[in-house]
Amino acid sequence: MASVNIKPLEDKILVQANEAETTTASGLVIPDTAKEKPQEGTVVAVGEGRVNEQGNRIPVDVKEGDTVIYSKYGGTEIKYAGQEYLILSARDVLAVVSK
């Protein structure tokens, strides 16, 4: 995972999506047009967290390097330095994958 010069704001998270499966369990090749949009990725950068009404910063529950599962249609896709990323709100992250 390369370092990126993008710093998400507040409770936003920068994620690099993991590659979608290219073959089925039985060995059939899945064409690009039939591939599911990936819902798993690696956290590349994390914002400092949002500020509540009392002025306290609430930190984000994930950290750089975490593998996360996120909402299928959440986030904004961006392209930076030839790489594709997703900027997600912390609310779009559904789970952290344990290794």
Curated annotation (Swiss-Prot):
Cited InterPro entries: Chaperonin_GroES, Chaperonin_GroES_sf, Chaprnonin_Cpn10_CS, GroES-like_sf
Keyword Ribonucleoprotein: no
Localisation per UniProt entry: Cytoplasm
Keyword Cytoplasm: yes
PROSITE patterns: CHAPERONINS_CPN10
One biological process term in Gene Ontology: chaperone cofactor-dependent protein refolding
UniProt cross-references to Gene3D superfamilies, sorted A to Z: GroES chaperonin
Principal place of residence: cytoplasm
SUBUNIT field: Heptamer of 7 subunits arranged in a ring. Interacts with the chaperonin GroEL.
Family, similarity comment: Belongs to the GroES chaperonin family.
Annotated HAMAP family: CH10 (MF_00580)
Function comment: Together with the chaperonin GroEL, plays an essential role in assisting protein folding. The GroEL-GroES system forms a nano-cage that allows encapsulation of the non-native substrate proteins and provides a physical environment optimized to promote and accelerate protein folding. GroES binds to the apical surface of the GroEL ring, thereby capping the opening of the GroEL channel.
Protein name as it appears in the record: Co-chaperonin GroES
Biological source species: Rhodococcus erythropolis (strain PR4 / NBRC 100887)
Classification lineage: Bacteria, Bacillati, Actinomycetota, Actinomycetes, Mycobacteriales
Originating gene: groES
